[in-house]
């Protein structure tokens, strides 16, 4: 039997409406590098959704390129970026930020999030250190919505972070690789308009949220990053056939598709969580979006790996392993049903100690 793929949320292609629009416009001639009419239409739709008519909107090819480009553009050579120690730029971008000449200044996370208080304390400690001229200066703050742990910042938390960042002259940058799943979450109270109001730069994820590829960077205040187009090209994030990206975001922001596309993923994740709880598996913590983290013993990991592709997350001091299961906008009811059947069979094949009978 073919393995079930729950390792990530970018294992499918693109939403059918995007494929249809790409096919319809395939032979259309247009200007390059995002200067075409479709990209401009997408920009206008995004500006309207963000309630920010003057915002700059730039289309880049992928998440790591986007983070590396934005962070390098916002920082001076002597500055680093404050980020949670669990952040994507901290762990899973192969040193892309450091390769660009900037240090990632990590703060301990709490379920993927960092607080305004922690950022404020970091800045105070830097200033109070008499040797701070010999140190990397904190120059901006990076967070993601949702976080790497699938948790989300509340509006109150984001407002507090924004306030501390502005008090300390630190640009606030939000990585929205999975933003559609936060927007679709029932517990979420942060809108695109809130992001535009509270952040200096943020990006709207496409790759993990229904697009074939691509991310849309939003800079609410035009001119905040001078010559950003050129900087994008320097970092290899600019597509000559830019309309390929524009078409996808034009579709995603037509009739509010982006704000609803994550609903199916969240419903699927909730079904999986319910099955795990009913079968007495140990959820590592509560994540309200499309990522599920479950703690397994070695026997359970081995059995699950026979039928399901999942992501290793971390090894606990207890010897148990935390694995991640991720749903996406395209996760089918059939695959969810098959996964729950696998989980139930695993439970029945193990004795009370969690070992295989």
Predicted ranges, named:
Residues 104-105, 172-174, 283, 310:
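Hydrophobic beta-strand scaffold residues
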Residues 101-139, 143-146, 153-160:
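PLP-dependent aminotransferase-class I/II
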Residues 153-185:
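Catalytic PLP-binding core of fold-type I/II PLP enzymes
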Residues 76-78, 270-271, 275-351, 357:
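Conserved C-terminal alpha-helix-loop-beta "cap" of PLP-dependent enzymes
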Residues 73-91, 120:
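Conserved PLP-anchoring active-site segment centered on the Schiff-base-forming lysine
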Residues 111, 137-138, 144, 152, ...:
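Active-site C-terminal subdomain of aminotransferase-like
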Residues 15-63, 85-86, 90, 96, ...:
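Conserved N-terminal alpha-helix of the aminotransferase class I/II PLP-enzyme fold
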């Amino acid at each position: 039997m073919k393995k079930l793929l729950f390792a990530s949320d970018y294992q499918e292609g693109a939403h059918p409406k995007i494929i249809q629009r790409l096919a319809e416009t395939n032979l259309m001639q247009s200007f390059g590098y995002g200067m075409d009419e479709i990209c401009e239409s997408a920009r206008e739709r995004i500006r309207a959704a963000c309630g920010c008519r003057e915002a700059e909107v730039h289309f880049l090819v992928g998440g790591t390129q986007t983070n590396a480009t934005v962070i390098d553009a916002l920082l001076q050579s002597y500055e680093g970026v404050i980020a949670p120690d669990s952040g994507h730029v901290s762990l899973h971008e192969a040193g892309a930020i450091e390769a660009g000449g900037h240090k990632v200044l990590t703060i301990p996370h709490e379920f993927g999030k960092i607080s305004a208080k922690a950022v404020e304390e970091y800045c105070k400690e830097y200033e109070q250190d008499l040797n701070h001229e010999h140190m990397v200066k904190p120059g901006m703050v990076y967070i993601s919505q949702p976080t790497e742990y699938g948790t989300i910042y509340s509006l109150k938390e984001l407002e507090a972070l924004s306030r501390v960042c502005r008090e300390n002259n630190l640009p606030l940058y939000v990585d929205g690789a999975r933003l559609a799943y936060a927007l679709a979450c029932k517990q979420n109270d942060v809108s695109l308009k809130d992001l535009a109001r509270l952040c200096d730069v943020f990006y709207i994820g496409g790759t993990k949220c229904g697009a074939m590829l691509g991310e849309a960077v939003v800079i609410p205040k035009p001119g905040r990053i001078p010559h950003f187009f050129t900087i994008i090209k320097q970092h290899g994030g600019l597509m000559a056939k830019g309309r390929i990206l524009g078409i996808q975001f034009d579709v995603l922001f037509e009739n509010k598709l982006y704000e609803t596309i994550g609903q199916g993923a969240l419903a699927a994740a909730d079904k999986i969580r319910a099955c795990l709880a009913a079968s007495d598996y140990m959820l590592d913590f509560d994540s309200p979006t499309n990522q599920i983290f479950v703690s397994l013993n070695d026997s359970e990991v081995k059995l699950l790996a026979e039928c399901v592709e999942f992501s290793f997350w971390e090894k606990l001091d207890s010897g148990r392993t935390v694995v991640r299961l991720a749903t996406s906008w395209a996760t089918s009811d059939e695959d969810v049903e098959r996964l729950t059947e696998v989980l139930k069979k695993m439970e029945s094949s193990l004795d009370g100690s969690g070992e295989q009978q």
